[in-house]
Each structure stands twice: as structure tokens, then as C-alpha cells.
Swiss-Prot record:
Domain of life: Eukaryota
Oligomeric form and interacting partners: Homopentamer. Discoid arrangement of 5 covalently bound subunits.
Compartments, record wording: Secreted
Organism: Salmo salar (Atlantic salmon)
PROSITE patterns: PTX_2 (PS51828)
The organism's taxonomic lineage, starting at the top: Eukaryota, Metazoa, Chordata, Craniata, Vertebrata
UniProt-recorded name of the protein: Serum amyloid P-component
Keywords annotated in UniProt: Amyloid, Calcium, Lectin, Metal-binding, Secreted
Domain (Pentraxin (PTX)): residue spans on this chain: 6-36
Record carries keyword Calcium: yes
Entries under InterPro entries matching the protein: Pentraxin-related
GO cellular component, one term: extracellular space
Cofactor(s), by name: Ca(2+)
């Protein structure tokens, strides 16, 4: 099931040299903007 995550914030509690986020998306148009 798809979920609208617009307006949501994800917090990584501890910054390390190996902290990372994986994004998997199926898009019908190119992504024109993203903030991380």
C-alpha cells in the first residue's frame, strides 16, 4: 500500500561515518527536488 509521506520528517538519532538512508521509489516523472 502506498502512503503519502509529504510533510513528514525522519530523524537519524546519531550521526556516524556509516549513517545512511536508502530511498526506493517508483516514479513516473523525474524527481526535480529533494531535501536531505
Amino acid at each position: 500500500a502506498h502512503q503519502d509521506l509529504s510533510g513528514k520528517v525522519f530523524v537519524i538519532p546519531m550521526a556516524t561515518s556509516t549513517s545512511h538512508v536508502k530511498l526506493h521509489a517508483r516514479v513516473s516523472e523525474p524527481i526535480s527536488a529533494m531535501t536531505m
